[in-house]
């Protein structure tokens, strides 16, 4: 099995920050994003590494970014370590397969969530109010139902350890202006529809997903990750049955385990049994194999 990477430490490179999963290095006119094997749930980072998770996320993101280039440009300069600047080469073994050299964009202060099915926080909102992010939905929907049309439900971008807050489209307009808000809404739904159709041919339902965008040289581009098991709900099509939660190829498996514990969903995280770690890794790898036809 490949070496597990919980955290990178590259003394010759300038660390710009660590997110829940990614370590980001500032290379001057570009960023180096290294996707570790960390996993978070309920905005808390677990103590254990998930085997090959960083590899899976990077490969799935690359796959989707390529599929969407005619809809919107993305931030990737290269995912081939040989193309990275000279100062990165001594770390090639750790970077291989889990890193991206990317453009330095100015991130927009909203996360762009699109939902094709009703699940997760959307289902909770609907049960309480009959709506999600101010969008009224038909009465009588059940958990995991397919929506007639995908809906755009943005959220704020919280600081590490805080929770994102769902916001209305009008609030999104307040934050970034109407023209940009309409553009990211339309692009988000267009990407989702194409991905949904591609995934459908591979036996996967993409129930919902989230994107981040930035401005680079005055142009809107998609940044961060693209439809990975961290940012999306992937369900097996062959066992889809509305009326309850669905089995999944994402971290829902981990969330479901954590829900059985007497844990307050705040740091420190509880220890994870070896079987949960292994099975979570297998679910991530299965998503990669199903989508791209290639494992590791």
From Swiss-Prot:
Substrates-to-products reaction catalysed: 5-amino-1-(5-phospho-D-ribosyl)imidazole-4-carboxylate + L-aspartate + ATP = (2S)-2-[5-amino-1-(5-phospho-beta-D-ribosyl)imidazole-4-carboxamido]succinate + ADP + phosphate + 2 H(+)
Pfam families: SAICAR_synt
GO biological process terms on file: 'de novo' IMP biosynthetic process
GO molecular function: ATP binding; phosphoribosylaminoimidazolesuccinocarboxamide synthase activity
Gene3D superfamilies registered for this protein in UniProt: ATP-grasp fold, B domain, Phosphorylase Kinase, domain 1
Top-level taxon: Bacteria
Known pathway: Purine metabolism; IMP biosynthesis via de novo pathway; 5-amino-1-(5-phospho-D-ribosyl)imidazole-4-carboxamide from 5-amino-1-(5-phospho-D-ribosyl)imidazole-4-carboxylate: step 1/2
Class in the EC hierarchy, top level: ligase
EC number(s) from the headed UniProt entry: 6.3.2.6
Assigned keywords, A-Z: ATP-binding, Ligase, Nucleotide-binding, Purine biosynthesis
Family as reported in the entry's similarity comment: Belongs to the SAICAR synthetase family.
PANTHER family registered for this protein in UniProt: PHOSPHORIBOSYLAMINOIMIDAZOLE-SUCCINOCARBOXAMIDE SYNTHASE (PTHR43700:SF1)
HAMAP family with a match to the protein in the record: SAICAR_synth
Protein name as catalogued: Phosphoribosylaminoimidazole-succinocarboxamide synthase
């Amino acid at each position: 099995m490949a070496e597990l990477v919980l955290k990178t430490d590259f003394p010759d490179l300038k660390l710009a920050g660590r997110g829940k999963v990614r370590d980001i290095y500032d290379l001057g006119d570009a960023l180096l994003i290294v996707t570790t094997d960390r996993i978070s749930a309920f905005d808390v980072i677990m103590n254990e590494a998930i085997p090959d998770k960083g590899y899976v996320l990077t490969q799935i993101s690359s796959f989707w970014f390529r599929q969407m280039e005619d809809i919107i440009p993305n931030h990737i300069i290269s995912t081939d370590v040989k193309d990275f600047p000279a100062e990165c080469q001594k770390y090639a073994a750790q970077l291989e397969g889990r890193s991206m050299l990317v453009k330095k964009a100015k991130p927009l202060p909203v996360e762009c969530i699109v939902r094709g099915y009703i699940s997760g926080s959307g289902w909770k909102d609907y049960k309480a109010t009959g709506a999600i992010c101010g969008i009224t939905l038909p009465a009588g929907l059940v958990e995991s139902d397919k929506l007639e049309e995908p809906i755009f439900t943005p959220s704020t971008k919280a600081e590490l350890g805080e929770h994102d807050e769902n916001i209305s489209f009008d609030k999104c307009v307040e934050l970034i202006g109407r023209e940009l808000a309409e553009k990211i809404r339309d692009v988000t739904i267009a990407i989702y529809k194409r991905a949904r159709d591609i995934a459908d041919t591979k036996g996967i339902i993409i129930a919902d997903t989230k994107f981040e965008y930035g401005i680079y040289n005055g142009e809107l581009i998609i940044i961060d990750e693209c439809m990975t098991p961290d940012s999306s709900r992937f369900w097996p099509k062959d066992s889809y049955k509305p009326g309850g939660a669905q089995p999944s190829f994402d971290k829902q498996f981990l969330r479901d385990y954590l829900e059985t514990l007497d844990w307050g969903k705040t740091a420190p995280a509880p220890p994870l049994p070896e079987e949960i770690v292994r099975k979570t890794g297998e679910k991530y790898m299965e998503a990669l194999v199903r989508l791209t036809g290639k494992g590791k």
